[in-house]
From Swiss-Prot:
[4Fe-4S] cluster binds at residues 367, 427, 430. Catalyzes the reversible hydration of cis-homoaconitate to (2R,3S)-homoisocitrate, a step in the alpha-aminoadipate pathway for lysine biosynthesis. It catalyses: (2R,3S)-homoisocitrate = cis-homoaconitate + H2O. Its main location: mitochondrion. Pathway: Amino-acid biosynthesis; L-lysine biosynthesis via AAA pathway; L-alpha-aminoadipate from 2-oxoglutarate: step 3/5. The gene is LYS4. This is Homoaconitase, mitochondrial. The lineage of its organism: Eukaryota, Fungi, Dikarya, Basidiomycota, Ustilaginomycotina. One of its GO terms (cellular component) is mitochondrial matrix. Keywords: Amino-acid biosynthesis, Iron, Iron-sulfur, Lyase, Lysine biosynthesis, Metal-binding, Mitochondrion, Transit peptide. Its cofactor is [4Fe-4S] cluster.
Amino acid sequence: MGASNLLRFGAVTRISTPLLSRRSLATHAAVNPASGTYNLVEKIVQKYAVDLSPGSHVKSGDYVSIRPGTVMTHDNTGPVISKFGSIGATSIYNPDQVVFALDHDVQNKSAKNLEKYSKIESFARKHGIDFYPAGRGIGHQVLVEEGYAFPQTLAVASDSHSNMYGGVGCLGTPIVRTDAAAIWATGQTWWQIPEVVKVELKGELPKGVTGKDVIVALCGYFNKDQVLNAAIEFHGSGLSSLSVEERLAIANMTTEWGALAGLFPTDDVTLSWYEKQIRKRDKLEFQIGSSPSPSNSHPRLNMNRLDELSRTLLRPDSGAVYSKHLTLDLATLVPHVSGPNSVKVSTPLDELTSQNIAINKAYLVSCVNSRASDLKAAADVIRGKKVAPGVEFYVAAASSVVQREAEEAGDWGALMAAGAKPLPAGCGPCIGLGVGLLEDGEVGISATNRNYKGRMGSPNAQAYLASPAVVAASAIEGKICGPSDLDVSLLPPSKGLKYSISTAANAAPADASSTDASAGGVEILDSFPTAFSGPLIFAPQDNLNTDGIYPGKYTYQDDITPEKQAEVVMENYDASFASTVAGLRASSSSSSSTKQGPILIGGYNFGTGSSREQAATALKYAGIPLVLAGSFGDIFQRNAINNGLICLESHQLVQDLTRLYLENEGGVRNSKAILLDESKVHIDSSTGSINLSFKGPDGAKIERTYTAKPAGIGRSVQEIYTAGGLEKWVKQRI
């Protein structure tokens, strides 16, 4: 078949270029029978980790090189193509690994947007990449429907809702655009395995309570960053009563909860769902006469693959390590609504119903709640009724496959007959694009996943989140309320929710970290510093965001020099910071083995906020070689490592400095930078050992020793650092 020919699987356009030499599918590191116990996240990462030392096994906290089974990009594919070209790459390492799905701005029919989409399709055609055009559906839904996101595999995407894949037992996590370009070119990128939180769901949901209510409640009741930058594993007796569609909704919104992944186990519910999907696809293919053999015609969704999966199910080991243990009794849950304008505010539906909150717009769209079962739930509420006067009700299916199924079931027609306004399958209002956005002073209720101020329109509007049934009921009543057939007498008391949180009995200490090497530490590359050393600057500020580190007014000055970035670093946080660091840098001199320079220590969630990589490069250009913090914003940390800035955590060091310097402020970290008097910190790259000496506030000399997390800088980070950043690392490998 020539390069111009197209192979079609349902609605997918498969662009085939057999003349392009394809490398084999991603190779996995063999799972080693190493001593110890491992959770499910660690076991899946082990399958996709590469360049491990013989006999090693990955653990939470480790930096590893991963070769994911799938990498998906959407409308941001254009910038990734630019990065791909800038690193000198000319061919895709493994086209079978890459998927393009256009879904965000699909209502935009401008010549500029259509040209952008055309260029992305042409690139896919040239390189033999699976391409799903605008209208096929939201990329995350497509990855599940087409079997790219498959149980016990690893899939990544340049989008924060990659967590959704966990609903089918696939470990999904977001990456940034530079990572995507690196995977295109080399098949791999790096990842720090997060801490893993065990979330135990007990009991069974009462009638009228949904998976959306579960995650809205989790976000609202555990709203103190308990799962920030963690991977979540769902456990418990309650899982058997949750459908795959409900699991997908829950996993999807673990992103808003603050997690980097939300993983359900592969169980009988999962296997039965996949068998049903395969049979359904077979029936369709027989109808159109394109299936040469039943159940094995699809390259990813077929009975052979499902049978193999059922024989090789992974389970966490008894005694596996989790940082926290959260429990939620599903039987005590009632319908909940999130907001306004925050997922951290979760209110029982009956409380809001009594307030008679009028709405202007309602939305049944997005990757969290626009599957066929969601459309059915809304249609069952609205069938034979009409949307209230003055209310606009927007509906978009998660994919064209979903819409076709809803049309055949009569659910789509019921929604349209009631006065709903159809939108093409895609993100649309959820991302603030297209028609139907909230205007000043309006109130909206949505089945989407985010209600941040201004996300769905005007920042002067109010947005609530709820289940599809509640959204539909609100649309026909013109106010926030539940369906008329919701029997509240069968629900538990709205104030009776049972939930708990504890530190897992076998959790590692806050500063503990694993390393696969012996007690001597990780192996250090010849060209990587054996240690980092210098004076210590304490920035006692939690949630120091990227705008505080690098002001937004400079972000789009593309011609700004490294020197200028260094001059404005931390300008919005502490105007004197840059000059202080410049003075310290002038007195530093590195040796061949030790990297000298001022070491910065921040508070918790350092670098939260936007994805601007200048927040990392400005610190590096200022002469700071390494940042310590209680914890980091994940995207900041990825950008830092991708640009050769080392990031390590030390919970105890942050706590000790807080007690010493902020006692009069009640221990609240909300102050400008402090240069520790006569300070010197030495950080061993192999072991993560931190040796610190300085004069305290009272003039007394203090010497302390800590262990960073991870306890030793991983090989993947070392390689990126010595190459001069991820882009140069990729250049060396293509």
